[in-house]
Structures are given as structure tokens and as C-alpha cells.
Amino acid sequence: MIGSLGVGDFLKCATAGNDLLNSLGATGSIATGLHNNVKYLDKFFEYLDLPTEMYYGTIPTEKRSDGKYDIEFHDVSFRYPGSDVYALRHLSFKMKVGERVAVVGMNGSGKTTMIKLLCRLYDPTEGYITLNGIDVKKYDYGDLLALFSVVFQDFRLFSFSLGENVSSNVEYDEERVAQCLKKSGMGETLARLPEGTKTAIYKDFDENGVEISGGEAQKIALARALYKDAPFVVLDEPTAALDPIAEADIYARFNEIVGDRTVVYISHRLSSCRFCDRIAVFHEGELVQTGTHDELLADEGGKYRELWTAQAQYYTISNEQ
């Protein structure tokens, strides 16, 4: 009969109407989210429009296959923008080619500030820093940054493939990525992944992606630093999320992992500093001691011995019942 509506047609219309209402509701939620995020975009663009006061030089860095780069701090002091307090004071310090330098100290002692200045995320308030005798400000900024592979404590991984996370690029050398992952202790995990380095991390964009632990994330970040193959490697608490066995493995293979690179190693665990050539001890924004583990431990009034003793007491087996 003309104008009649069968049961099947009615159900189709009802389903379509319900889908339409759901879609309108979702559209409303998206519109609300966009409206709420506009204020954050405004702040973001305000940040991008801030003028930079850093001087960008034009001298290209020397491309040396032997990795012979020396960096030296010359009476460097630094205050963060908007602060009257010096985070670092009168730092004079030289890093030699191929040296492994551990940087230790309590929170707020100036360790991370020193690293930020080393990588030229900031410029010194006073004093200057040289690379092979030339003020780092005179070098091309991009060339200078290319000399450093850095793993900060607050590193981030992305919901891309494992290979893209290690190489920081869409196109990468799969074999080299695998080698770096094996060096960082991810070899067994990599072997278990169904798609190898093409396996997605997390499930945000790929339902077949894998969830990783904090320790695995730290190993991937270390592999990322190795893949860049820069002459300077900066590691800020690189084993903080690892279990004791994995951490011991990293220490045992440290020289094999970093090769002939110059390494700056920041750690609160003083036991991890023993494999380094030299230890720099910071306290209240100043470099107060430098030397080997044995040399610093022999200084009974030194800050390093104080820190070492404070940590060692928790690892000493007591005979008390």
C-alpha cells in the first residue's frame, strides 16, 4: 500500500535517527573541546612570538671523524630569567675528548643547569663556554646542537613505530636501530615483537601497538641517543627506571655502549659513578670537588664522601638481630 511503512523500514529509520543524534552529540563535544583549547593555542602562539635574545653564530662546527672536541666552561655563572638567585656560580671546568664525567650533587645543586648551558639551551649570565677554543655563541646553532645526544629525565616517546622513536625520523636504517636497541638492553624485547622495529608503541593510533614499561621506555631513550651518533652524549639519570639487574648490565657494558664518545653522566646513585673517569661534585650552585671515586672518597671532609656515606648505610648488612 502506498504511504505505508514496513517494520523493516521503520527500524532502519529509527536506527538512522539514533545515529544522527549520537553524531550531533559527538559534534557538540568536539566543538566544546575546540572552544576550551583555543585559550591554550593563544598562549602557545604568544610563546612562539616571544623574541629570542640568544645570539646565533654562523661558523660551522668542525666535522671531525676522530671526535676530538674539547668543551670548557670559563668562570660561568647563570641566573634563570626572572630570578635574582644564581643557579650556577663561577664554574670553570674542562671536558677532555673521550672522557666519562659523572656529575653528582643534591637536588638544586646546579647539575641540570650545567647540562642546559652545555647544550646551549641557555647562555651564561656571566663568563663563556668554548668548543675547541672558540666561544660556542659563534657557532651555527644547528651545527652545535648536532654534536650532542641528550637523554633528559623527562624524555618523551611517541605513539609511532619503535624505529621512528629511536631514529626520530620516518625513514631510518632498520639494522642500525636494531643494533642501538640491543646495546641499550632491548634486544630480547625486540626479538619478541611481531613486526620488529615497525611495531607501534602504545595503542593511540594502532590497536596492535604494544604498551611498554618505564624501564623499557628508558632503554628506548638510550637507544635514541646512540642512534644519533654524536660525539657528546649527555645522560641524565639514564637508569632510574631500570631494575637492579638491568642497571648492573648497563654499568658492566657502559664502555661498549658509548664507545669513544665523550660522556656526561648525571646520577643520584653514586655507585654508578665508579666506572667514570672523573666525578664532578656540585653543591649549592658551585663545583666543590673533582676527581676519581677513590680520590674523592679519601677526602674525609668532602661533600662526595658525605653523600656516599649517606647512601652506603642503606646497603650495609647489619649484624644486629
Where would I find each of the regions flagged by the language model?
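Cytosolic ends of transmembrane helices, especially the final helix of ABC transmembrane type-1 domains
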Residues: 13, 19-49
